[in-house]
Amino acid sequence: MADNIDLELSLQTNHSMIINKRLTQSDVDYNNRLHLPKREFEQFILPEMEWELVMNLRNSVEVIVKDVNGNEYHVTLVKYQNGHYYFMGKWMDIVRAKGYKRDDEISLLWDKSNEVFYII
């Protein structure tokens, strides 16, 4: 219960660190990756991330994604050579756990103080 309250407060005060995404077929199928909206990611999320984390994105970094129920997932965040950003690795664990399908809408909140993404 406390996690939900904290998340709601974060959403109200940190709305500039939220990106929205309508899932495509490739986000939920065997490709095992979520394509993150580049413009929004670079505008809202990257400036809030630690410099060292941003510098390592080409090599890929492990980040934590939490849902509103407190479940925690470790995914790989990577920047491809084409400049696009993806969640990879355990992304499909989230898809299966949440039952996501094409055209579902999700929001990602970057919690700068804890260096964690929240998926809502």
From Swiss-Prot:
The keyword DNA-binding applies. SUPFAM superfamilies: DNA-binding pseudobarrel domain. InterPro entries: B3_DNA-bd (IPR003340), B3_domain (IPR051442), DNA-bd_pseudobarrel_sf (IPR015300). Residues 19-120 bind DNA. The keyword Transport does not apply. GO terms for molecular function: DNA binding. It is found in: Nucleus. GO terms for cellular component: nucleus. Keywords: DNA-binding, Nucleus, Transcription, Transcription regulation. It comes from the Eukaryota. CDD domains: B3_DNA. This is Putative B3 domain-containing protein At3g28853.
